[in-house]
Each structure stands twice: as C-alpha cells, then as structure tokens.
UniProtKB/Swiss-Prot annotation:
Record's function text: Transfers a succinyl group from succinyl-CoA to L-homoserine, forming succinyl-L-homoserine.
Record site: Important for acyl-CoA specificity: R325
Predominant place of localization: cytoplasm
Protein name per UniProt: Homoserine O-succinyltransferase
HAMAP family the record matches: MetX_acyltransf (MF_00296)
Residues the record lists as binding substrate: R227, D357
Family: Belongs to the AB hydrolase superfamily. MetX family.
Alphabetized NCBIfam families for the sequence: homoserO_Ac_trn, PRK00175.1
GO cellular component assignments: cytoplasm
Domain AB hydrolase-1 residues, every copy: 51-360
Pfam family, one: Abhydrolase_1
Listed EC numbers: 2.3.1.46
Record key words, sorted: Acyltransferase, Amino-acid biosynthesis, Cytoplasm, Methionine biosynthesis, Transferase
Amino acid sequence: MRLAFPEDSVGLVRPQMLHFSEPLTLACGRSLSDYELVYETYGELNAARSNAVLVCHALSGHHHAAGYHSPEDRKPGWWDSCIGPGKPIDTRRFFVVALNNLGGCNGSTGPGSLNPATARPYGADFPVVTVEDWVHSQARLADALGIQQWAAVIGGSLGGMQALQWTISYPERVRHCLAIASAPKLSAQNIAFNEVARQAILSDPEFHGGHFQEHGVIPRRGLMLARMVGHITYLSDDAMGEKFGRELKTDQLNYDFHSVEFQVESYLRYQGEEFSGRFDANTYLLMTKALDYFDPAAAHGDDLAKTLAVARADFCLMSFTTDWRFSPARSREIVDALIAAGKNVSYLEIDAPQGHDAFLMPIPRYLQGFASYMNRIAV
C-alpha cells in the first residue's frame, strides 16, 4: 500500500456521474434519449466560477486524467504529469474537469451500455458520434456544474480537435484554447491508418457484427492488431530505433513465422494484448470515425480562417518535431488561419524524439512552455 502520494499529486480522486434526460440530437441524425457522463474534478471552483478548465481526452483516453483511485494504484491518471499542484495545469489555481466522452468504454454511455429500447447492450447499434456531438454533450456537463465559461479548454491529439471545436460551437464560453499535437482535419494517410485498424476489428470472427457481448466473447485479435498499427504511428522512427533497434529477445533466429524474435515485436504484442483486455472494440471504431469526420472548415468552403473567425478565445498551439501522425506543419496550418482571422495565438514547437505520444510525456521544454502559457491565464 502506498504510504503517501507525491507532493505535486492531486492524490485520491473519485469518479462522478451525471445523468442527462434531455435528448441529444447527433450529427448522424439519430439522438440519445438519455445518457450518462462520467467525470473527475481536481482543485476547487472559485466563487466567481472563473477558474474552470476542461481537459478533453484523445482516442483511448478517459476521465481519469490525474491522481489515483486507490492507494494500491501503480500508475496515476493519463495526464498526471501536467495536472496537479505546481504543474502546468496547476490545481492550486484551476478547477479541472476531465470526462469520458459519449461512445467511450469507461463509464459514460457507449456501446457497452444497455440500450433502453432493447434492454441489451447497444453494441454496433450505438450511433456514430462526432467531435461536435461531444462538445455539445460537454456543454451540457458544464451547465450542470454551473460553469458558464471555461478559463481554458485543453486537449492533445483528438482532444485538441475538441478544444478547437469548442471555440467554434460555443465561442462565448471559452477564454483560452490549447490544442496540442493536433490538426484541423486528418490527412488521407491518417484516415488510411484508421481504416486498417477498423478492418482488423471488423474481420475478427469474434466481432459478431459488433454484438460480441451477447456472445460472451471479445474480438481480442482484431483489437490487438488495431492497437499495434496505431501504436507504431504514435512513436517516431528515432524513438523506436533508440528503444529497440534490431535487438533480439534471444541469441538466435528461429526461422519461422510464429516466434517473437525482435524486441520491437514483443513490445507491440504486449501493447496490443494489454489494450485488447481493457478497451471496447465498438468504441475503437467510433473514436476513429470521429477523427476521420472532424473537418470544421468543410462548412466554410475549406477556409479555416473563416471557420475560426467566430472564435473569441486566445489560442496556444504546441507541436513536436518528430510527430509524423500530426506533424508540426498541421499545427502551423491552424496558427496561420488564426493569424489570418486576427486572433491572438501563441505557438511552441518542441524538439522531442518521442513522436506523437510526446504530448503525454514529462518533457521539460514542453512542461515549461505549457506552464508559461497557463500562468498567463487570469482567473
């Protein structure tokens, strides 16, 4: 048992849940008659309710962004390096809200939830959700918490897309937007990677058309392959070379197709197997489609500057030099559009070898720049 938490930790945290009974109409044309959102909070909301920060998660993220659920927990929340006393999102100043998005598999209504119309798990019948849908549901969460305006909406990768969408859908409710390792829309290559991952899941015999829960099975192999493909794109070539090179697990080659011979093979298989035991296959499909569909400028003739003209927030964009999934050039597209739209924008490009996953890591230059911007936010 852990005797004490680090001084800069938010410590023990407890997930909370809110039930929403007002129907939510989705971009796909369907609606959810009622739904639940699981969330966590860190820090204290001030009397003026002016210090609230929303943290939006990426593809495999969830509401547990910081702290520990139990003294026995070996690892803290997924963004613990950035949230806590004295950290970039300083909980001595800010009241932080992190949630699990609709369609997720960590407590919020999603494919694993019971469909009230059938009393069986939604499975593949859960509606396709978009980034815009998530933002609308997050706005309802803010209403329920009595938060009329966020001091900042922050996210990395897919989370950064949500932060951008907030400034478009609810411009008057966001003072600062921080989009980290993100993009204004996916490239064809990124959509292609997502499609390969989806096909790995869809072609797994245990998927059963998305209703695998009713068969008492999990499409582990499909999920494993999807995660392996995705994980390769989250790392840089340099990082993989530095960590694994061509190192073998044993001293010899086996000259077959079934043995795990290289350390990088072992790593990918471990990541895939671990992921397949904790993530929902239908949620993976939904998250990748939300990524594919995000393209707010499409409604404005592909003019991103025109799209962002409605925003009232100040912006901070950060990218990482070796991120080839959402390269610095994609962040600079957003920066250029914001400048063209006459918005206040700060941009930091961090030299880091870790690739796309760098936004999750305690890289000194990243934490320094992140904290510097957050310290400028008046509460």
